[in-house]
């Protein structure tokens, strides 16, 4: 529509009324950044605007940039567009972008995490502010895990499983190497595990981000870098957190006998676990699962929904069947694909090829069962 508040351009998602972009994938003059993952925040923009809690991680990842920050919920006016940022629950500093112009309200979600069908605050991501539904006329949503097979287990159960794996390894004198994305996933792991089991060490790519989290007030354990450990005997009871790129590298030889595991939402797929060639797969994601996506969308009260990266075809079809006006933007965002190089990424891609079949298989009964009333989510409905 010609009067849309956000349109798609070759540089990224563009707000014509405000003359700025949201998470552009090519360099632009003004970029509003939803969070510091590499597919949403790129180098080369002249000016950046992001939520205040994101400053440390953005500067850690992008270096010296012209960055303006905005506290959550504080509104600014830019060329007549009223703009504010609201928590997305994804990673430290993640934000949804609320735009209001001439009576219309749009919200661009970026990536977000909602705890499925549960209203238990214990299911929120404990390393950042929880997702805040914002009332709007149009909601631009991700769909990284937009298939019915993706349903996250309660966090207490998940971390009990991780702790049991680590404890069993420690009792056997074997190091525990847990692979997960260096920004967001690693800190979620460090926050959730039982620190009493043994020492915790990290890869050198993880610790700078840990420092940014601690500076923002997030309680994380002390995490010496593994390469600085002098007493190699400590590794026999240790948990070592590292990015996926460390798997099978010469860096791992220092640990001697070790068991490895991978933490990702993609571990829900048996093929991904097999192709990753790890001893264990833990299903841990910083994105909303299928029920979480439905719950978040319903809570906005939006009449129109535009789907971005992930399983767009499935989500658009499902939304249309439920009565929403639905469409999609073709973006260059990668979801968690950065965590799945090589054959594992191919496994996820192969599962996308089955999307149309999966969409056909969602019965009315299934749709009715997974739609959760949004009444249990606190909603910011200012201006909409």
Which role fits each region the language model picked out?
Residues 41, 94, 116-117, 186-189, ...:
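Short, well-ordered alpha-helical microsegments
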Residues 195, 226-384:
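C-terminal regulatory/interaction regions
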Residues 91-99, 112, 116, 138-144, ...:
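Active-site-proximal loop/helix segment associated with metal-binding centers of metalloenzymes
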Residues 4-23, 215-238, 242-251:
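A short, well-structured beta->alpha microelement
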Residues 59-61, 78-82, 117-119, 149-150, ...:
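Short, charged, surface-exposed secondary-structure boundary motifs
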Residues 2-17, 21-26, 30, 36-177, ...:
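His/Asp/Glu-rich metal-coordinating catalytic cores
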Residues 66-71, 197-204, 323-332:
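Short hydrophobic/aromatic-enriched beta-strand-loop microsegments
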Residues 159-241:
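Hard-cation-handling environments
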